[in-house]
């Protein structure tokens, strides 16, 4: 996925799923399944239920995304 094609949205983590997947509710009300980006996984960034996150999505599949940032 090219960086300029990505859509970045803000959301809140609703649920933790197996294999470092998360259910995230976006600000517009949609619920998507998201996984952690490689740099967050490498640096052991912990994501818990209720965290505010930035999700990067592709325009081709708006039901899946990648968590690229966790707000403090």
UniProtKB/Swiss-Prot annotation:
It is found in: Cytoplasm. SUPFAM superfamilies: Nucleic acid-binding proteins (SSF50249). InterPro entries: NA-bd_OB-fold, RNA-binding_domain_S1_IF1, S1_domain, TIF_IF1. Transmembrane segments: none annotated. SMART domains: S1. Its main location: cytoplasm. Disulfide bonds: none annotated. GO terms for cellular component: cytosol. It comes from the Bacteria. Belongs to the IF-1 family. Component of the 30S ribosomal translation pre-initiation complex which assembles on the 30S ribosome in the order IF-2 and IF-3, IF-1 and N-formylmethionyl-tRNA(fMet); mRNA recruitment can occur at any time during PIC assembly. One of the essential components for the initiation of protein synthesis. Stabilizes the binding of IF-2 and IF-3 on the 30S subunit to which N-formylmethionyl-tRNA(fMet) subsequently binds. Helps modulate mRNA selection, yielding the 30S pre-initiation complex (PIC). Upon addition of the 50S ribosomal subunit IF-1, IF-2 and IF-3 are released leaving the mature 70S translation initiation complex. One of its GO terms (molecular function) is translation initiation factor activity. The keyword rRNA-binding applies. The keyword Protein biosynthesis applies. Keywords: Cytoplasm, Initiation factor, Protein biosynthesis, RNA-binding, rRNA-binding. It holds the Pfam family eIF-1a. This is Translation initiation factor IF-1. Residues 1-72 form the S1-like domain. PROSITE patterns: S1_IF1_TYPE (PS50832).
